[in-house]
């Protein structure tokens, strides 16, 4: 038993955080940069997220009156601006999730990718992200 319990709103006994990573088809492009455009099956699976799942998730959370956190790579922010616009229009937040799941070799390389993702956030989301997840 906790000796100093946290007082949750409305008498709740706990809190739960659910968040989404919208990686879309970014993973195939970093894993197979030379021929990713020919790999239609994984690309199609990846596009399901921003094109089908996100609208369904947003509608569910709209009905429930819940706000959500999405962590989205910068490449996906640039590639799926309609999904980004819908997420933001619903009052949800978008966190920094790298640029393209790159594997930076050194600190300058890591900073370059991090900054590139920040640029996407500023351009498409209107400012800096509220948080970061690797």
Labelled PLM ranges:
Residues 1-133:
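Catalytic alpha-helical scaffold of carbohydrate-active enzymes acting on polysaccharides/glycoconjugates
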């Amino acid at each position: 038993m906790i000796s100093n319990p946290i007082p949750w709103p409305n008498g709740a006994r706990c809190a739960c955080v659910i968040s989404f990573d919208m990686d879309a088809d970014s993973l195939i492009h970093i894993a197979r940069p030379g021929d990713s455009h020919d790999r239609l099956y994984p690309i199609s699976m990846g596009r399901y997220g921003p094109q089908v799942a996100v609208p369904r998730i947003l509608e569910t959370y709209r009905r429930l009156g819940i706000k959500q956190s999405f962590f989205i790579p910068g490449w996906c922010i640039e590639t799926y601006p309609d999904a980004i616009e819908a997420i933001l229009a619903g009052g949800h937040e978008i966190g920094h999730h790298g640029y393209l799941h790159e594997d930076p070799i050194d600190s300058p390389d890591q900073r370059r990718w991090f900054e590139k993702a920040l640029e996407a956030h500023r351009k498409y989301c209107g400012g800096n992200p509220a948080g970061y997840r690797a």
